[in-house]
Amino acid sequence: MTDCRYFKLSPRDVAFRLELIHRVHGLEHAENYFNNISNKLKTFSAYGALLSGYVREKSVEKAEAIMQKMKEMDMAASSFPYNKMINLYSQTGEHDKIDMLMQEMERKGITQDEYTMLNRMAAYIAASDISGMERILNRIEEDRHFFVNWNVYSMVASGYLKVGMIEKALAMLKKMEGKMPLQGSKLAFEFLLTHYANTGHKEELYRV
């Protein structure tokens, strides 16, 4: 797979190369590679890899152009490109565009998976929109298809702490403890300790 003169490249190979070229040589080289491959190899995988690169670089205009192209070519029928754009808008603070994307997903019957929900929740937390955050939490808790792990309650606790809602944060931390693995998770434990420290309730910090 090292030389296209001797090995036939698959769409997955092209996507892998695009990701690698972007990481090693930069976005411009990745774009040149994409522009020079045959149309046959410009599949969902290739467009998805290029979109991921634009999101990584926070290049909104180019990401939106590729997203539009994917829609025109019927390559935006899954949650993947939408999740990428939600991630991008969350990073750039364009929360109104996230709402539009989620409405579009609902209108087109595209499943809003766990990644979609968590990205939307993160955007609400960044905007200190507590009602929005709670709305997403309720959807996740009520949908039997979602697995609510400790990280979800950790995110919600951080949202409450951000706006000074200590009692609600403490309630989420209790739920977080209930979702932590029995054998313990170093990462989860570190988050839990940090959150309890931020509540100012030292007795909870010492308890855990």
Predicted regions and their residues:
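Helix-turn-helix repeat elements of alpha-solenoid scaffolds
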Residues: 19-27, 56-62, 91-97, 122, ...
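Amphipathic alpha-helical segments of tetratricopeptide repeats
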Residues: 2-3, 72, 103-107, 138-142, ...
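Acidic, glycine-rich loop-and-beta core segments that form the ion-binding/anion-interacting portion
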Residues: 141, 153-165, 177
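Pentatricopeptide repeat
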Residues: 10-15, 30, 43-48, 52, ...
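Inter-helix linker motif
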Residues: 5-6, 39-41, 58, 74, ...
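Alpha-helical repeat scaffolds
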Residues: 30-37, 63-67, 98-102, 133-140, ...
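Structured C-terminal portions of repeat-based eukaryotic scaffold domains
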Residues: 174-179, 187-208
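Leucine-rich repeat
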Residues: 1-91, 103
